[in-house]
Every structure is written in C-alpha cells, then in structure tokens.
UniProtKB/Swiss-Prot annotation:
Name under which the protein is recorded: Cysteine-rich protamine
Alphabetic keyword roster: Chromosome, Developmental protein, Differentiation, Disulfide bond, DNA condensation, DNA-binding, Nucleosome core, Nucleus, Spermatogenesis
GO annotations of cellular component type: nucleosome; nucleus
Known tissue expression: Testis.
Role this protein plays: Protamines substitute for histones in the chromatin of sperm during the haploid phase of spermatogenesis. They compact sperm DNA into a highly condensed, stable and inactive complex. This protamine condenses spermiogenic chromatin in a pattern which comprises fibers with a progressively larger diameter and lamellae that finally undergo definitive coalescence.
Biological processes annotated in GO: cell differentiation; chromosome condensation; spermatogenesis
Disulfide bonds: C16-C24, C64-C80
Major location category of this protein: nucleus
Amino acid sequence: FCGSKPRCRPRCKPRCRSRSKKRCRRCRRRCSRIVKKCCRRRSKCCRRRRRCPCPCPRKKLRCCKRRPKRRCPKRKKKRCRRKC
C-alpha cells in the first residue's frame, strides 16, 4: 500500500519509481507514492496504482474490475469483485 515502498527489480526501477507526482484518480490530489505498473511480466513490483494517503473519503481505487480473478491485496482469502 501507499505507506510501504514498492518492491522493484533492478531493471524496473527507472520506470517504476518516477519522481513526478501522480494524481489520485478519485480526489485528484497529487501523490508521489502512487505507483504505476512498471513491467509486463507478473511479479511483486508489477501492481496497479495504489491508493493515495489523502483524507478524501473516496480515496479507494478500483483494483479488481479489469482482472476479476485476481486476488484482492486486502482480502487475500476471498477474490475481490468489488472496489477494495
């Protein structure tokens, strides 16, 4: 999540850890901790945008609409079909 640093392979670091601040989809607040998907292969660093630590009540981002079979990071046991 936003508080933890993204785990990246050495070849992914330049693409994944960009210095430019990106905006949270919902509240449009700029956050340097939002990380984009950095490489095509499935690995620990290849995750979609994380949530921004903003006080906005609608800060949660959609993680499972595009990949419904993927397990939700919050609910590891159950597969997430809604916003997580």
